[in-house]
Amino acid sequence: MNTHNNNYQQRSMDSAIVTINDKGYIQSVDRKTCELFGYTIEELQLQKVNILVPSPYKEQHDTYMQSYFETGVRKIIDKSRVVEGLHKDGSVFPITLSVTEVRIWNKRMFIGSIESIIDKRLIIYTDVHGIITYCNRNVEELIGYTPAELFGKNVSALMPSPHAKSHSEYIEKNYHGGGLWKMLNRVRNLPIKHKSGVVFLVSILVTKISTDGIDMFKAIIQTPPKEAVFTINGDGIIKACNFNFTEPMFGYTQKDLLGNTIGLLIPEMSKIIDNTSLNLTDSHDPQLQQQQQTTTTTTTTTTTTSTTSTTTSTPTPASIAVSGNNISSPPIDSPLTTPSTPTTFNHSRGVESWLGRTRKVDVWHRDGSRFPVNLEIIKLQGENSMFSLQIKKVENPRVYGKDKDKNGGGGGTTENKDGKQLDTIKESKEHRHSKEKKKRKKDRDHNNNNNNNNNNNNNNNEQTSDSSDSSDSDSESRSKKKRSSKKKSRRDDSSSDSSDSETESSSSPHKKNRSSNSSSNSSHSNAPHESSYYQPEMIGEYTLGKTLGRGNYGVVKLGTHINTKEEIAIKILYKEQMTESEFTRCKREIEILKQLYHPFINKLLNVLEKDDAMFILMDYCQGGDLFHYVNKFGLKGVKMVNSPDIGDQVLMGVPLPEDDTKRIFTQICLGIAHCHKLNIAHRDIKHKNILFDNQMNVKIIDFGLSNWSYQEKMSFCGTPAYAAPEMLLGINYNGPEVDIWSLGVILYSLVTGKLPFINVTDMIVGKFILPPSIPLDLQDLIKKMLTVDREHRLNIMNVLNHPWLSKDPASSTLISQNLLHSPPVVHQPQPPQHQKIQPTSIIPNFNEVETLKNNILNNNNNNNNNNNNNNNNILNSNNNNNNNNNNNSNNNNIINNSNNNSNNNNNINNNINNNNNVNNNVNNNKNNNNNNNNNSNNNSNNGNNIPNSSNNTNSIINNNLYNQSLSPQNNNIYQHSPQHQQHQHQQQHSPQQQQHQQHQHHQQQQQQLQQQHHQQHHQQHQQHQQQHQQQHQQQHQQHQQHQQSHQQPPVYFPTQIISDDFNLTSQLQRTQPNQQVSFDTNQSYQQQLQQPQIPHQVLMQQPPQILSHSNNQPINNYYVGQQPIQQIQQLQQQQQLQQQQQQQQQQQQQQQQQQQQQQQQQQQQQQQQQQQQQQQQQQQQQQQQQQNDPNFQPHLRRIKMSKRDNSYNKRKSEDGDSYKKRDNQSYDDILKDEGNKRLRELQTYSEGDKSRQHYNRDSNDNSRDNNRYNNRDNNNNNNSNNNRERDRYKKNKNENFDYGKYKFGKSNEDEENKDKPNIVREKPDFKPSGSLKNDSSSNYGTISSGRNNNNGEEDEENKIKLKWHEPAEAKLPTEKWMLYPFKGKDQLDTIYLHRKKSFLFGRNRDIADIPIDHPSCSSQHAVIVFRIRKKENPNTGSIKTFILPYIIDLESTNGTFLKGEKIEPAKYFELRPKDKITFGTSTREYILLCEDSIEGDESEEEDSD
C-alpha cells in the first residue's frame, strides 16, 4: 500500500493546473494544460470547463457541482478520479482529475489538477508457434522482464497453470489443425504471471496480422480499469459511455454498447426496467448465438406450460435481449445469484428506485466471466430524465463474496493455521449454476463422441469464467510453498509448472497427458534462449546498464565506458513520445546546460542525436536524490496534495540535523545563485531534481523547464507542491522569485520532514505552521522565503547573507569561497552605445567635495604635475550602471562615481590611499592664493585635458534639476546604506575588513560634525542674505566689467548633489567656450571653499541646494561671490530672449529650405513625367513595327555585343531595364530568360561578321577563362582569345542546356520542330528531389548586394537570391551544373558542380564566418566558399585576380576528408579540379569540376572508380 501511495504522490506533483470560478468558467490555465488538450491560453480563458471532458463526464460534472452547492456533499471535491479528456481535435484520452476548493479574496474558486495517464499497455508479437519476436518497453514495468529476456521465449512462459500447459496444444489444434478461432479479436480477462511468481489478472486482446505472407499474432495486454461511467435514460438504454475503459473492463466496444440496454452488463437492473420497451433479437457474438437460441426456447416452453410460474417468478436475464446491435445478456438462473436483490420494487419508478445509495452488484464480461462492482446512480440535470451510472470495481472480491454468503445464507471462508482465509467448497447454488452451464455447452457442441474431452472442455470453461478466483488460489498456493521451503532464490518456471501439473493430474488423467506434451514443447522452445547470449546496447563508447529513472517520454540509464569503465548517466529521450513543445524544451535544456559550469550543478558531458532518440550524457550521481535521502526509513502514511483523504501535512521523511541541513541548503542556494547570475531561472526545484555525488555534494539537475529570466511570463512550470502562488493563479512573474519559494519549501521539509502546505488554498494564502523547536533565525528565513508578496520575498543573495547561514562558520566559509572563486561568467555581448557617457563621480564625504572644487578652480604651478596626471581620473566619470569595463578601469580614481555595488570596496580603498594627494593639493592651494594669474593659466592648461560633458548633462541642467528636492527616503546623504556596507564587508578579503570598518566609523563621525556645521551655516546665511542684496548688485556690475577684460577657459563645476542608498553623485557641467567665469581675489580661502565659483550664464532659476537629512532644509546656498540672485535672473532672461531670436531665425531658414526642396521635387516630377511620355511613345512605335514585321520574335532578345558595335549603348540600356524587371519576375520566367540568352549567344555568333564580334558568354559570369582571356587582351592577345572562343562555341552550337525543369535548344530527335524557332520547353522527366519538392523560401539563399537603403541598412529587396539544383539522373556522366547566382557575379568564376553518385552537398546553412559577398554551398558537415586571391606577374607587373573555391570543416563529429586525409576544422583548404571530398562517415564522394575538365567526364569517371 505504501508503494502505491508513493507512486501516486509522485504523479500528483507533476500535474497541470486549471483555475475555475464558482460558475464553472476557466480563469487561468498553465502551459502543460494547453499542451495536453491542444488549445492556447486565450482559447481556454472564460470558457466552460466542460470543454475539456467528453460525454458522459460533461453532464456528470455539472450535476455534481450543483449538488455540492445545494447540499454540501463533496462528490468530486478533494478527491482524485480517473476520467477522460477531450482534445481539441476530438480525440479522447484518459486523465486523472482532482478538484480542490479555495477561497481567494473572499471568492470561491476551484483548482483542478489534471494529469495525463501514461500508456502502459504491453504489446507482444509472436509467430504461429507462440515464440515471442517483439515486445515494447512496458514489459519491464508490467511483468518484470526486459525485452532481451523475453525474445525467443514461448508465450506460455508468461501464463500460470493450467493455461501454460494448454496453450501449445491449442495452437496446434486450432491454427495448424484448422480449428475454430474463438479466442481472436475478443477482449478477455486472463491471469498472467510476473517474473517474481505473482499471478494477477489482465485484460488481453489477440489479433492476427499478415506481413508478406507471414502470419503473426499481436497481443495487447493491460491491467483492467477500475472505474467506468455510463449515461442511460429511464428505459435503461445506454446513451453514452467512456471510450477508453469499457472495452478492457467489459469486453465490449463503445460502438457495441451505445443504443443497447444496461441489462447486458448488469442483469439485475433488468428487473427495474420496463420489459415492454425491449425487443428480443439474436446475439452477434458467435460464442453466445447457440446459447441465445437454447435459453429462449427454454423460456418460451416454460411460459406456455404454466401461467402461474410466469406471473409469480421474475423473468431471467437470459430472456432479456438487446435491440440495436444484437447483443444478448449473460446467462443467469434466478434472482438468488445476485447479491443485493431488492425484495420489492416499483415498476413505475424504474431506474429512480435505485437512487440514493451505493449497491454491490455483479457485472458480466463478454467472455462469460463476472466480477463484483459498486454501482452508484445519480439523476442528471435537465428536462429529460437521464441518469449517470458510476461503476467501480471491488478491490477484494473474496471479502465481497464473504458478505454475500452471509446475507444469502450459503457458502463461507475458512482459515488456516496462519490465520489467512482460504476458499471452501462451492455452495449448492454455485453447483447448480455450473451444471446448467455445462449442459448448455454440451447442447452447443456437435462432437459428443468422447465424454472425457467434453469434461476437459467444461473444466477449461470453468477456469476461464472464474479466472479471478483461480489466479488468487494459485498465487496463495505458490506463496505457501515458498514459505514452507524457506528458499531465498525464486523457483524456475519449469519446476513450478511441473509441480502444478502434478497436483492437477490427480483429478484428471486426460489433463495429465496433455500437460506433459505441452510442457515438453515449451521446454524445447526455451532451449535456444537459455544458451543464447545477448549483446548489450551501445551508445557511442558506452554500454547501457540498469535503469536509473523514468519520465514521461524517456528513461535514464547507467552508461559504462568500454575502456576506462567510467560510469555516467545517459538520459534517453524518445522523439516518438515527445510533442513539438517537449522537444523544444529538451533543446532548451541542452542550451542552458552548456552555459552552466558550477560545482553544485550536474555537468553536461556530450549530446548525441539519432533519428528516433536523443542521448544526453551527464555525470553519474551515486548518492541518489534528496527525496530518498530524507526518506531513509521509508514513508509511513504518505498523503499528498489533492489526495482523497487529505487533512494532514504531507510526510516527506525524517527531519535532518541542523548542520546537515545547512550544508545541503547552502550548496543548493549557491548553485541557484550561479543560475540567477546568468539570468537563468530553474522553475522546477524539488527533491527529485537534487542529487548527490559519491562525496554527498549537491548536484542540481533537470533544467527542462528553465528559461531565461527577468522577462514577465505567465506559463505554469514545475511541480504544484513546490509552485509559488503567482504560478498557481497565472500571474506574470520573472523567474528568480519562483525559485526562492521552492527553496523555502525544501528548507521547511528538511528541518521538519513534512511539506509546509496541506492544500492548494494554504499555498495561495501562504498559510503554514512553524514548529516551536525550530531556531528563531531559521523561522525568520522560512517566513521571508515563503512570503506571498513576491516583491517582499528575499532574493538569492539575501538568503545567503541571512544570519542563520552567515553565523555558521562552515556555511559562511563555503559561501565566501564560492563567491570569491566562482567560475567565470560569459556575458553576452551588449550592443555598442553611440551616446556619449555623462561624467559622474562618487563623493564619499563633504571635505573631499570642497577640496575637489578648490583643486579644480585654483590650480597653481605647484600642483600642476598632480593635476595633469589625475585630472582625467578626477573628472572622468560614468553614469552607466551596467558598464563593468568602465568601473574596472577606474580603480585608480580619487573619486569614482559609479552605481555598481561590487566595485565600491576598491573605490573606498582608493579614496583612502589618495587622501595624501588631496591634502597636498589643499596645502599647495593655501600657499599660492595670491598667484591669481598663475591659477588662471593653470586652469587654461588643464582645461584641455578635461573631456567635454555629454549631452545628457546639458539635458539634465536644462530641465532645472535644482528645483527638484531630494527624496525624503534618502535621509543619509553622505552615508552609505547598511545593506551596501554589509555587501562591501562580505566581498573584501580578511586583511581589508578591519581597515574598512575603521574608515567607516571615522567617516560617520565626520559626517555628523559636518551636518551640524552645515545647519548653523545655513541659518546664518539666511539672516545675512537680505543685507547683502544691494552689495550683490554692485558687485555684479563690477563682475561684468571684469568679465570683458579677463576671459577665463571653460571649467567644470558641481550643479547638483544627489544622494541615494549606496553613493553620492555629483553631476558636472562644462561652460560653453563663449561663457566667462570671474574670480573674486579678495575672498579668503574659506569663503572660496564655501562659495564655489559658478558661471553666471547658467540656465537655473535658483542656486543648487543640499537638503538636510533631518528636516529637508537647505544646508548651503551656492552662489557666485556676492552676486545677488535677482541679477542672475536678469541675465537668464536676457539669454532666453537671445535664444528665442535664434530659434526664430532657424525657423525662417528651415522654411526657406523646405520651399526650395518643394520646388526641386516639382521639377523632378515634371521631368519624370516627360520621360515617361517619351518612353510610352517609343513603346507604341516599337509595337507598331513589331506588328508589321512577321519574323519578329519578342522572346529572343539579342545580348550585348562588344564596345566596337554601333548599338552598344542601346543594348546596354535594354539590359538595365530587363534587370529592373527581374525583381518582380517569378523563378520560372528568369530560367526562361537565361535559357533564351544562351540560344541567342550561339545564333549571334554564327550570324554577322565574326572578326568584329568578341563574344562574352554571359554578362554576369566572370569565370576563370574570362579572367585569363581578359588578361591576354591586355597583352595584345585578342586574336588567340577570339579563336579559342570560336572553336568552343562552334562545337557547342547545337548543344542543349538545362536549367532546373526547363530545357533549351533544338532536339535532334524532333524532326518536326527543325524549322521552328528555338523556344523554351519544359522537360517531361524532371523530378525534383529533396528540399526542391516544396518550392519554399528555405530552398533559397541570399548574399549581400552592397546596396543600402536610406537608413544605412541593407535593403532586403537588393539581396541576391541563390538556389541550388539537382541534376536529372539520366544525365549524370556529362551533365554540367553550377552554383548560379542571378546577379552580382562580376567577381565570381563559373564553378560547375557535378554529382558523382546520388546527391549534391546537402542543404544550405547560415554561417556567420562565411563572407557575405560570396555564395556558398554547404553540406551537413562542411561548407564550400569562394575567396578572391590576387597574384602579381613578375614580368609585366600586372595583378591578376583569381576566384578560387575553398572548403571549411564546421567542427563536425565525424570530420571531413579531402583526398583521403582528414582536414583540420575551422581552416580554409583550397580545392582544385577533380578533388574528391568525403563528408564524415558517408560513403558518398564528391568531385568538383571546372570548365576545362567537363569534356572528359566519361573517361575520368572510370579512372576515379
From Swiss-Prot:
Record GO biological process: intracellular signal transduction; regulation of DNA-templated transcription
GO CC terms in record: cytoplasm
The Swiss-Prot or TrEMBL record annotates one GO molecular function as: protein serine/threonine kinase activity
**The protein, known as:** Probable serine/threonine-protein kinase DDB_G0280133
Give start and end of each FHA domain: 1399-1463
Taxonomy of origin reads: Eukaryota, Amoebozoa, Evosea, Eumycetozoa, Dictyostelia
User: Which keywords label this protein?
Assistant: ATP-binding, Coiled coil, Kinase, Nucleotide-binding, Repeat, Serine/threonine-protein kinase, Transferase
Instruction: Identify the EC number(s).
Output: 2.7.11.1
Write down the species. Answer: Dictyostelium discoideum
| Listed InterPro entries | Aur-like, FHA_dom, Kinase-like_dom_sf, PAS, PAS-like_dom_sf, PAS_fold, Prot_kinase_dom, Protein_kinase_ATP_BS
NCBIfam families this protein is in? Answer: sensory_box (TIGR00229)
CDD domains, per the entry: FHA_SNIP1_DDL-like (cd22676), PAS (cd00130), STKc_AMPK-like (cd14003)
Can you give the residue ranges of the PAS domain?
A: 2-72, 108-178, 215-284
UniProt lists compositionally biased (Basic and acidic residues) regions at 398-407, 415-430, 1202-1271, 1283-1301, 1313-1326
